[in-house]
Design a protein with these regions (language model features):
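GHKL/Histidine-kinase-like ATPase module
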Residues: 95, 102-104, 110-193
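Short, functionally important structural connectors and interaction interfaces within domains
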Residues: 3, 17-20, 179-180
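GHKL-type ATPase core
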Residues: 8-140
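Short conserved segment of the HATPase_c
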Residues: 1-7
């Protein structure tokens, strides 16, 4: 996923498995970020094994490192610095990352995202988590101002964009309530299924 564009497992989404409903571009963002970074470090912990990769200017330095771990926690940590030879400005506002991770937490119910922001004065930590996904987000947004409960619709469908393309699967969840103080209509595409 980090070394080859479009190497992710989401493209074979019609045969079941991990990414059964995904239409996302897994492998594009991770690889493009790695290629355009001064450095990128990736650590993955799963199945009592820790995997690490180190990249510099698009090159994998040292290959895949694998070691046993006693950690019961699993997950992926990515740390990188955009390359100033690629980008004219690498000062990305923290609000951008906060917004993206909040939306990802919303569409990935029960999955916690943690953002560490290293500053000159120390380390800031932000956590994003919605146990019930968009339902909790709607409740949080409306607060006590809703005059109905949050209603949800969930559905799964198959579709095809063109006759010469294969069918794909889609999963959708809609959550809404009524409020005369909060007016919003938002759409989020989750490419993480």
């Amino acid at each position: 996923v980090y070394c080859e564009l479009y190497a992710g497992g989401k493209y074979d989404n019609n045969k079941g498995g991990m990414y059964e409903y995904s239409l996302g571009l897994n492998g594009l963002g991770a690889c493009a970020t790695q290629y355009s970074s001064e450095y990128m470090d990736v650590t993955v912990v799963r199945d009592k094994t820790q995997y690490t990769l180190h990249f510099e200017k698009g090159e994998n330095i040292g290959g895949l490192q694998k070691s046993e771990t006693r950690s019961v926690q699993t997950g992926t940590v990515q740390k990188w610095k955009p390359d100033t030879e690629v980008f004219t400005d690498i000062n990305i506002p923290i609000e951008f990352f906060q917004d993206v991770l909040n939306k990802q937490a919303m569409v990935n119910a029960g999955l916690k995202f943690v953002l560490y922001n290293e500053t000159e004065t120390g380390m800031e930590m932000f956590e994003y988590y919605y146990e019930n996904g968009i339902v909790d987000y709607v409740k949080e947004t409306v607060g006590d101002d809703g005059f109905t409960t949050v209603e949800t619709w969930e559905m799964e469908r198959e579709g095809r964009d063109r006759a010469d393309k294969e069918d794909y699967r889609m999963k959708m969840q809609v959550a809404f309530c009524f409020s005369n103080k909060v007016n919003m209509l938002e759409y989020y595409h989750n490419s993480s299924y």
